[in-house]
Design a protein with these regions (language model features):
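Left-handed beta-helix
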Residues: 91, 96-97, 101-103, 107-108, ...
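Terminal amphipathic alpha-helical/low-complexity segments used for targeting or macromolecular assembly
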Residues: 1-89
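Residues at secondary-structure transition points
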Residues: 44, 137-138
Length: 196
């Protein structure tokens, strides 16, 4: 499966980073004091910034026709990957590159995202978004924009979650919900309400 490159220019990189900063801190301008008072958010934003740079540099390397520039970019990617992975361990968060839309908001640690998520998704913590036991890269969830995923919610398998859905705390989602604005809860998850 080929990589999907969401960030193809420096301008797009800056836009992704700005949107992630606003999602983390509620503002594009962050004071030094605010960073000190919120170490989790500060480290999370630094992780997301490294993730976005990694995604951009992968596109730059793979689209380069110059072998020397490509090798230099590969070296940059390795350095960023090491920093990103160290922060990932510190935060207890795992997000696969090229899988997460801009403006992601993670409220608490223990989040694994191995599925495609749209823009402005909220993860409240202790969430797993992943594939079934087959391990195939195609058996992963596709989550729309503006989806709010409650604490402890798990989304597994080759399923689709529509835009603007809310997934309740502790829900185990193993089937698709394609109606936008659906409230989903339970084990196994079922529709509680939808947009009217």
């Amino acid at each position: 499966m080929k990589n999907f490159y969401p960030i193809k220019s420096k301008k797009e990189l800056e836009m992704f980073i700005k949107t992630d900063r606003i999602a983390c801190f509620g503002s594009d301008k962050i004071s030094f004091e605010k960073k000190l008072r919120n170490p989790f958010k500060t480290n999370l934003f630094n992780f997301l910034k490294l993730l976005r740079k990694y995604e951009y540099l992968c596109f730059k390397r793979d689209s380069s026709k110059n072998a020397i520039k490509s090798k230099l970019t590969s070296f940059q990617i390795k350095l960023i990957d090491i920093k990103k992975n160290n922060l990932s361990l510190k935060l207890d968060i795992e997000i696969n590159p090229f899988h997460c839309g801009k403006g992601v908001r993670i409220c608490h640690p223990n989040v694994i995202i191995n599925g495609y998520t749209g823009d402005n998704c909220i993860f409240h913590g202790n969430n797993v978004i992943g594939n079934k036991k087959t391990g195939a890269k195609t058996d992963i969830p596709k989550i729309g924009n503006n989806v709010d995923i409650g604490t402890g919610a798990i989304i597994i398998g080759d399923i689709v979650i529509a835009d603007n859905c809310v997934i309740g705390a502790g829900a185990v989602v193993t089937k698709s919900f394609t109606t936008p604005g659906t409230v989903i809860a339970g084990v196994p998850a079922k529709e509680i309400s939808g947009e009217k």
